[in-house]
Amino acid sequence: MNESGQVRVVVTGHDADGKSVVAADKSVPPEATAAAGTRFHLLWGADQPPSYPDTGAESTDLVPFPAVGGIRFAESVILPDAEVDYEAESIAGLQLQPGAAPGMHTTPSVDLGVVIEGEVCMLLSGGVEVHLRPGDCFVQNGTLHGWRNHTDRPARFVVMLVGTEHRGLG
């Protein structure tokens, strides 16, 4: 991530002769519609399984959470608790859970993630907190969850989201 909070993404593709080329080299700003205390960078995505060879071109109308079978590659930065107003919910594309702790939500996806910087707590049903450190991986199977950072430094994780059917389980 650079000083402006943007993430550089290099995407490859194929030219007309089938040779590998740089299809995109871009800086991605955080999404404006992330959860309170979260900077969400949608780095890359597809709404259907990729087929090769392709140009590496990306759809310009991607939403943060994929449809069934779609994929997203993203980075999340979780700010320290002291910097966050968890009551100021602004989560787009998520199913918030009434009566649960602020920010608790489900997504119609399997989220495969790895913490790359800092420490973060994954909140689950019943107040369960799972402490994650750099190198720790998680698989979020469409379950009710939220994120907290009890330290004084931002935490970062990268995540691959795979769109799934979700029948409303909390």
Residue ranges and their predicted role:
Residues 1-55:
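N-terminal leader/capping segments at the start of a protein or of a new domain
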Residues 77-79, 105-122, 163:
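Short, conserved beta-strand element in jelly-roll/cupin
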Residues 27-28, 59, 72-107, 141-144:
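Conserved short histidine dyad/triad with adjacent acidic residue
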Residues 104, 122-123, 145-151:
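Short beta-strand His + acidic residue motifs that chelate non-heme Fe in jelly-roll/DSBH
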Residues 126-142:
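Short acidic-glycine-tyrosine-enriched beta hairpin
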Residues 111-112, 137-146, 152-169:
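A short hydrophobic beta-strand segment most commonly corresponding to one strand
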